[in-house]
């Protein structure tokens, strides 16, 4: 079942925009941000090494983002600077469960956007929209070694529910990594947590 999220979500400094319809120009813009940030992103995101040219991001736009929006499997948004509209990164509400009214948020930022609070603002904007539409629980998973990524749910008031030990294979370092599970409930969001 589809979750009824808006095509745009605005906050003070960022705007989250549905990346559809997919265009090659948009794919090139996303690819350039990934390519500029490749060294940092590949440390944490397994898909980065498979992104070698703009066509790879176009495939994601068509077969991933657009298809997921249509089927309700996921809701990817481009994170843009509200004033300049420059691309900062991507945030995604995924693994939506109609039965449990839950979903997971995943995200990445380009290197030039890190350290300015953009992702914290984007997460808060997306969680606001999702909780208003009836979601009860949002989860964020972070690699325990990725301190910057783990700081985002911490700043957004998510509760660290636990650590999944050796739960994900890290192909860059050739080892299993631990993953933190962070969560926020609608009741906590309503209290302003």
Where do the model's predicted regions map?
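Conserved GNAT-fold acetyl-CoA-binding loop/helix
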Residues: 39-63
């Amino acid at each position: 079942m589809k979750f009824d999220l808006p095509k745009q979500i605005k906050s003070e400094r960022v705007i989250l925009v549905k990346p559809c319809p997919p265009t090659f120009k948009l794919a090139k813009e996303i690819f350039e941000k990934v390519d500029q940030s490749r060294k940092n992103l590949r440390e944490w995101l397994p898909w980065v090494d498979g992104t070698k040219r703009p066509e790879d991001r176009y495939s994601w736009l068509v077969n991933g983002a657009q298809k997921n929006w249509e089927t309700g499997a996921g809701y990817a948004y481009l994170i843009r600077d509200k004033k300049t509209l420059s691309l900062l990164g991507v945030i995604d509400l995924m693994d939506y469960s109609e039965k449990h009214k839950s979903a997971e948020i995943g995200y990445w930022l380009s290197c030039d956007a890190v350290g300015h609070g953009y992702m914290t603002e984007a997460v808060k904007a997306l969680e606001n929209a999702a909780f208003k539409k009836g979601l009860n629980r949002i989860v964020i998973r972070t690699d325990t070694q990725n301190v910057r990524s783990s700081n985002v749910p911490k700043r957004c008031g998510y509760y660290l529910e636990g650590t999944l030990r050796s739960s994900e294979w890290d192909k860059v370092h050739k080892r299993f990594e631990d993953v933190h599970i962070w969560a926020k409930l609608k009741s906590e969001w309503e209290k302003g947590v």
